[in-house]
Amino acid sequence: MIFFYCPNCWSRIEEDEKVCPKCKAEIKAFDHLSYFEKLVRALNHSERTTRIRAAYILGELKDKRAVKPLAKALNKAHGIRDMFFEEAVVIALGKIDGEEALPVLIDLLDHPSFLIRGAALNSLSRFKNKKATQAIKKALDDPSLSIQELARKILQA
Protein backbone atom coordinates (compact mmCIF):
# COMPACT_ATOMS: atom_id res chain seq x y z
CA MET A 1 0.00 0.00 0.00
CA ILE A 2 1.29 3.45 -0.90
CA PHE A 3 0.85 6.35 1.50
CA PHE A 4 0.88 10.01 0.56
CA TYR A 5 1.95 12.85 2.83
CA CYS A 6 1.55 16.59 2.86
CA PRO A 7 4.98 18.07 2.01
CA ASN A 8 4.36 20.86 4.51
CA CYS A 9 3.18 19.18 7.73
CA TRP A 10 3.77 15.50 6.80
CA SER A 11 0.22 14.49 7.66
CA ARG A 12 -1.08 11.53 5.71
CA ILE A 13 -3.32 12.64 2.83
CA GLU A 14 -5.21 11.03 -0.01
CA GLU A 15 -3.42 10.70 -3.35
CA ASP A 16 -5.67 13.20 -5.12
CA GLU A 17 -5.71 15.88 -2.37
CA LYS A 18 -5.19 19.39 -3.69
CA VAL A 19 -5.05 21.04 -0.25
CA CYS A 20 -3.90 19.42 2.98
CA PRO A 21 -6.90 19.00 5.28
CA LYS A 22 -4.73 19.57 8.35
CA CYS A 23 -2.46 22.54 7.53
CA LYS A 24 -4.34 23.87 4.47
CA ALA A 25 -1.16 23.94 2.36
CA GLU A 26 -1.63 23.73 -1.39
CA ILE A 27 0.06 20.46 -2.41
CA LYS A 28 1.04 21.59 -5.94
CA ALA A 29 2.93 24.55 -4.48
CA PHE A 30 5.73 22.15 -3.48
CA ASP A 31 6.27 20.78 -7.00
CA HIS A 32 8.76 23.56 -7.83
CA LEU A 33 11.18 22.58 -5.05
CA SER A 34 14.53 21.13 -6.10
CA TYR A 35 15.50 17.58 -5.19
CA PHE A 36 17.89 18.99 -2.57
CA GLU A 37 15.14 21.14 -1.02
CA LYS A 38 12.78 18.16 -0.90
CA LEU A 39 15.45 16.08 0.86
CA VAL A 40 15.97 18.83 3.43
CA ARG A 41 12.22 18.98 4.06
CA ALA A 42 12.14 15.18 4.37
CA LEU A 43 14.45 15.41 7.40
CA ASN A 44 11.28 16.38 9.29
CA HIS A 45 9.07 13.67 7.83
CA SER A 46 6.77 11.85 10.26
CA GLU A 47 8.03 8.46 9.08
CA ARG A 48 11.45 7.69 10.55
CA THR A 49 12.76 5.64 7.62
CA THR A 50 12.12 8.58 5.31
CA ARG A 51 14.12 10.85 7.64
CA ILE A 52 16.99 8.34 7.72
CA ARG A 53 16.92 7.93 3.93
CA ALA A 54 16.94 11.71 3.41
CA ALA A 55 19.97 12.10 5.71
CA TYR A 56 21.76 9.28 3.91
CA ILE A 57 21.14 10.79 0.46
CA LEU A 58 22.21 14.26 1.61
CA GLY A 59 25.47 12.73 2.79
CA GLU A 60 25.96 10.97 -0.53
CA LEU A 61 25.38 14.25 -2.38
CA LYS A 62 28.18 15.87 -0.33
CA ASP A 63 26.52 19.26 -0.73
CA LYS A 64 27.85 21.71 1.87
CA ARG A 65 24.46 23.43 1.97
CA ALA A 66 23.18 20.35 3.82
CA VAL A 67 25.30 20.95 6.94
CA LYS A 68 22.96 23.49 8.58
CA PRO A 69 19.73 21.55 7.92
CA LEU A 70 21.38 18.31 9.09
CA ALA A 71 22.64 19.99 12.27
CA LYS A 72 19.19 21.47 12.88
CA ALA A 73 17.55 18.07 12.36
CA LEU A 74 20.05 16.56 14.77
CA ASN A 75 19.13 19.10 17.45
CA LYS A 76 15.43 18.29 16.96
CA ALA A 77 16.10 14.54 17.03
CA HIS A 78 18.03 14.83 20.27
CA GLY A 79 14.75 15.59 22.04
CA ILE A 80 13.00 12.48 20.71
CA ARG A 81 15.99 10.13 21.07
CA ASP A 82 15.95 8.46 17.68
CA MET A 83 19.48 7.05 17.74
CA PHE A 84 19.24 5.56 14.25
CA PHE A 85 18.30 8.90 12.73
CA GLU A 86 20.93 10.72 14.77
CA GLU A 87 23.55 8.23 13.61
CA ALA A 88 22.48 8.65 9.96
CA VAL A 89 22.84 12.42 10.31
CA VAL A 90 26.30 12.12 11.89
CA ILE A 91 27.46 9.79 9.12
CA ALA A 92 26.05 12.17 6.49
CA LEU A 93 27.88 15.11 8.06
CA GLY A 94 31.11 13.13 7.89
CA LYS A 95 30.68 12.53 4.17
CA ILE A 96 30.39 16.23 3.44
CA ASP A 97 33.91 17.45 2.85
CA GLY A 98 34.18 20.88 4.34
CA GLU A 99 34.97 22.82 7.45
CA GLU A 100 31.25 23.57 7.91
CA ALA A 101 30.58 20.12 9.38
CA LEU A 102 33.61 20.04 11.66
CA PRO A 103 32.23 22.05 14.64
CA VAL A 104 29.03 20.01 14.66
CA LEU A 105 30.96 16.73 14.66
CA ILE A 106 33.30 17.94 17.40
CA ASP A 107 30.33 18.93 19.58
CA LEU A 108 28.88 15.44 19.10
CA LEU A 109 31.83 13.95 20.98
CA ASP A 110 29.94 15.11 24.10
CA HIS A 111 26.71 13.34 23.09
CA PRO A 112 25.26 11.12 25.84
CA SER A 113 25.20 8.06 23.56
CA PHE A 114 28.45 6.25 22.88
CA LEU A 115 26.96 5.16 19.53
CA ILE A 116 26.66 8.75 18.39
CA ARG A 117 30.10 9.64 19.79
CA GLY A 118 31.55 6.68 17.85
CA ALA A 119 29.86 7.77 14.63
CA ALA A 120 31.19 11.30 15.20
CA LEU A 121 34.70 9.92 15.71
CA ASN A 122 34.52 7.90 12.51
CA SER A 123 33.27 10.96 10.66
CA LEU A 124 36.04 13.11 12.14
CA SER A 125 38.63 10.59 10.95
CA ARG A 126 37.91 11.71 7.37
CA PHE A 127 39.13 15.21 8.18
CA LYS A 128 42.89 15.51 7.99
CA ASN A 129 43.45 18.70 9.93
CA LYS A 130 44.58 19.90 13.34
CA LYS A 131 41.09 20.59 14.76
CA ALA A 132 39.86 17.09 13.94
CA THR A 133 43.02 15.47 15.31
CA GLN A 134 42.73 17.44 18.57
CA ALA A 135 39.10 16.38 18.94
CA ILE A 136 39.99 12.74 18.31
CA LYS A 137 42.76 12.98 20.94
CA LYS A 138 40.21 14.36 23.41
CA ALA A 139 38.17 11.17 22.88
CA LEU A 140 41.03 9.17 24.41
CA ASP A 141 39.56 10.30 27.76
CA ASP A 142 35.98 9.31 26.89
CA PRO A 143 34.13 7.39 29.63
CA SER A 144 33.46 4.55 27.17
CA LEU A 145 36.32 2.12 26.63
CA SER A 146 35.08 1.38 23.10
CA ILE A 147 35.30 5.08 22.22
CA GLN A 148 38.80 5.30 23.70
CA GLU A 149 39.85 2.28 21.64
CA LEU A 150 38.31 3.71 18.47
CA ALA A 151 40.14 7.01 19.02
CA ARG A 152 43.44 5.13 19.44
CA LYS A 153 42.86 3.18 16.21
CA ILE A 154 42.03 6.35 14.30
CA LEU A 155 45.12 8.15 15.59
CA GLN A 156 47.37 5.20 14.70
CA ALA A 157 46.05 4.94 11.14
Identify what each model region corresponds to.
Residues 2-3, 31-42, 63-77, 98-110, ...:
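Amphipathic alpha-helical scaffolding segments comprising HEAT/armadillo-like alpha-solenoid repeats
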Residues 43-44, 59, 75, 94, ...:
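Ankyrin-repeat helical core positions
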Residues 6-9, 20-23:
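Short cysteine-rich clusters marking metal-coordination/redox-active sites
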Residues 13, 27:
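Cys/His-rich microdomains that often coordinate metals
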